[in-house]
Amino acid sequence: MAFKDWMNNLRDYFVEDDEEFNEPTRPVQESRPTVASTPKPKVEERKVQADYQSRRPAQTTPKPQTQTAAPKRSASTFSKPMPEKIVQQQTVSQAQSLAATVSTIAIKEPRAYADIMESARIVKNGECVLVNFKFMGDAQARRSIDFMTGVVFTLDGDIQNVGGQIFLMTPANITVDAAKEMSILAGQNFESYDIY
């Protein structure tokens, strides 16, 4: 009997350990995504530092003779070029934003309703369109204006009657202040034109 009791106790010993062993595996699986996400920023930092080091020899700046002792510098002095890079990135991004602010205005004079699709594509691509309906009949022009109003509405843009049969369609990122237009035109004595 002693042997049988010993075997049962031995079996119970391993069964209890198996149940306890299965519980810690769940938190280990949950912690894996956090471990995988932390190395990514380190890789990006290395790329930025490598990118900066590859650009540094290309820069030619006059250096005083007191700076020729570069090997004697401590590790803390190497962090100073990083703000220069940040400043360079800011100036590049400012130049890109200035280039992005330059926009073109396409001028279209459709002769049929089918020609309006081209104007809609231009507005969809983020440019302004000035549409003159002088070569189109009244019924087709109204139908075209209804279509253009729908296009501009879906793109969160704007459509304005500039004068008579001329309409300006603008995408969402461009706004036109009609009050400024009116003051400019009034100052130049263009009272005879229909401006709404």
Curated annotation (Swiss-Prot):
Protein name, per record: Cell division protein SepF
InterPro entries with a match to the protein in the record: Cell_div_SepF, Cell_div_SepF/SepF-rel, SepF-like_sf
Domain of life (superkingdom): Bacteria
Gene Ontology BP, a term: FtsZ-dependent cytokinesis
Protein task: Cell division protein that is part of the divisome complex and is recruited early to the Z-ring. Probably stimulates Z-ring formation, perhaps through the cross-linking of FtsZ protofilaments. Its function overlaps with FtsA.
Protein family according to the UniProt entry: Belongs to the SepF family.
Location in the cell: Cytoplasm
Keyword Lyase: no
Region of interest: Disordered: 15-80
Quaternary context: Homodimer. Interacts with FtsZ.
GO cellular component: cytoplasm
Matches recorded under Gene3D superfamilies: SepF-like protein
Feature: compositional bias, Low complexity: 57-72
Alphabetic keyword roster: Cell cycle, Cell division, Cytoplasm, Septation
The organism of origin for this protein: Lactococcus lactis subsp. cremoris (strain MG1363)
Pfam families registered for this protein in UniProt: SepF (PF04472)
